[in-house]
Curated annotation (Swiss-Prot):
Note in the entry: The porphobilinogen subunits are added to the dipyrromethane group.
Keywords linked to the UniProt accession: Porphyrin biosynthesis, Transferase
Catalytic activity field: 4 porphobilinogen + H2O = hydroxymethylbilane + 4 NH4(+)
Name of the protein in question: Probable porphobilinogen deaminase
Modified residues (S-(dipyrrolylmethanemethyl)cysteine): C240
Source organism of this protein record: Aeropyrum pernix (strain ATCC 700893 / DSM 11879 / JCM 9820 / NBRC 100138 / K1)
Keyword Transcription: no
Coiled coil feature spans: none
Name of the encoding gene: hemC
Function field: Tetrapolymerization of the monopyrrole PBG into the hydroxymethylbilane pre-uroporphyrinogen in several discrete steps.
EC number, as in UniProt: 2.5.1.61
Length: 307
């Protein structure tokens, strides 16, 4: 089967295409040959601006999805964490989610191994993620967190040049890129990741050959885990412009545990919620936790502590 794959042109994006399509071929039992249609996203065009200032829903996905919707590509491949919760009920649909090598964040520091609270007072930590910023300030309010955009190679170069004392990156990205650098993995129970972090999603048009081929196949075991984390984002969406984190893990074959967190942007307030249930109910559990986060954040706003 030949497919045209819309994706961003970064080295990590192309590696994710390769992983997702090779895994999808095995899953569906179909030999797939692909041609990459490279697309520049809004996030790529405005690479010098903080993500929250761009003001675009799906800053890394919108233009890529348009290539599929217009027929210029058959499927799109995204980092699941970059995908908004709306827009995939038709005409576009998430048809497959590739497994993740890790959900964890990684702290890379010029000061050596350690957790965020071990960074020296006045240290400068670079990140473009509102979640990583809030969590870092929650654990260590004595550091400075500054915006840092760019691919992983660029961020590591700026760290080596001394522009930052530490950065936080996705461990999955480090693994996929084969980066040889010393880092401290941050346990998800302590530093929960972005919902869907590490997973790679495949999007297709409803009714397309790819969507029909995958429609009735059993879902891979990590499918429900991924949807539990997205469920947190769905549930929190209505009242939450606040940083949200989520981590789901299977408990044996039939159960799942979901951890969710919301923080004020400055890290001064944080709320954790956890729940367990049957794995088929994973998405519902995630949505319920997200709604709980939303209610808590609404209370912060009423008392002037959510900003």
């Amino acid at each position: 089967m030949r497919v045209r794959v819309a994706a961003r042109g970064s080295r990590l994006s192309l590696l994710q295409v390769e992983q997702a399509l090779e895994e999808l071929s095995r899953y569906a039992g179909v030999s797939m040959h692909w041609e990459v249609v490279r697309v520049k996203s809004a996030g790529d065009v405005w690479s010098d601006r903080p993500l929250e200032s761009i003001g675009v829903v799906g800053v890394f996905t919108r233009e890529v999805d348009r290539a599929v919707a217009s027929g210029a590509a058959d499927i799109a491949v995204h980092s699941l964490k970059d995908m908004p919760t709306s827009g995939y009920g038709g005409p576009l649909k998430i048809v497959y989610i590739a497994s993740r090598p890790s959900a964890r964040d990684a702290l890379i520091s010029r000061q050596g191994p350690g957790r965020v609270e071990d960074l020296e007072p006045g240290s400068t930590l670079g990140t473009s993620s509102a979640r990583r910023r809030a969590l870092s300030l929650h654990y260590n309010p004595r550091i400075r967190v500054e915006n840092l955009r760019g691919n992983l190679d660029t961020r590591l170069r700026k760290l080596r040049e001394g522009l930052y004392d530490a950065i936080i990156a996705s461990e999955a990205g480090l693994i996929r890129l084969g980066v040889d650098v010393e880092y401290t993995p941050l346990d998800p129970s302590y530093f929960p990741p972005a919902p869907g972090q590490g997973f790679v999603a495949v999007v297709a048009r409803v009714g397309s050959n790819v969507e029909k081929m995958l429609r009735d196949l059993d879902k891979p075991p990590w499918w429900h885990v991924a949807w539990a984390e997205r469920g947190v984002l769905e549930g929190a969406r209505a009242g939450c412009r606040t940083p949200v984190a989520a981590y789901a893990e299977p408990l044996g074959r039939s159960m799942v545990r979901v951890t969710a967190a919301a923080l004020s942007p400055d890290g001064s307030r944080a709320y954790w919620a956890r729940a367990e249930g049957r794995i088929e109910e994973a998405r519902r559990i995630g949505v319920s936790l997200g709604e709980e986060l939303s209610r808590v954040v609404e209370g912060w706003h009423k008392t002037g502590g959510g900003s």
